[in-house]
Amino acid sequence: MSKIILTSFLFSILFFACKNKGNNHPKQTFILEQQRLIHQGDSLTPMRVLVITNKQDSLVLRKKSKAVLFSKQQDSTLALLSKRLVATVQDSATLGVGIAAPQVGILQNIICVQRFDKENEPFEVYYNPTIKQYSKKTQPCKEGCLSIPDRMDTLEIRAYAILLEYDKIDGSHQYEMVEDFTAVIFQHEIDHLKGILYTDYLHEKVHAEGKKH
C-alpha cells in the first residue's frame, strides 16, 4: 500500500519533474574559505573526511547545510567539488557507499550516493536533495559512517522506499522513487545535511524527533 501511495504521488508531479529551475536561483558562489578547500586538489584528489572524535570536526558535522544556489560563477567549483566527493568516497582509506559535503567541511546540500539499484552501481551526486515521502514499511540495516570510525550499528527505522526531490548540476529539477538499500544510503546522507548522525537514532529521544518526517 505504501508503494502504491508513493507511486501515485510520483505520477501526480510527473509533469513538473523536468522543469529547469536554474534561472530562478539568485547568483551566489562558494565563500572564499570553501573555494580554497575545494581547489586544494584536482578532481582525483580525495578530501579529508571530518570525524566525530575531533572536537572542531564535530562542531561542523552538527551544523545544518545551506541550499546550493546555481550560477555560472560557481559552475567550475561545483563540478570540481562533485568529482572530489566521488574520489573521496572511493578512496582506499575510506571506501564508503555514500558521502555528504559537510563530511569534507563544505556546508552545502550536496551528497554522493552509490546506486546499487542501477547497472554497474555508479556513484552519483545530488544537489538540494529532500525526501518528500517515506513508506510505512521499514527495513533493518547495519550502518556505518565515514565520520564515525570503527563502528557499525543496526537501525530498524529506515524506510524501505522513499520519494526523492533533487536538483542536477545543470539546475534541472527531478523526482525519483528509490527502494531497498539505496534508499537507506539516501536517508543516511540527507541526515548529514541536517546535522544528524545515524547514532542519534540509537537514543530514544532523538529517534522520536527524527521520525517527524
Task: Put a short name on every predicted segment.
Residues 1-28:
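Bacterial Sec-dependent N-terminal signal peptides
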Residues 18-213:
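Positively charged
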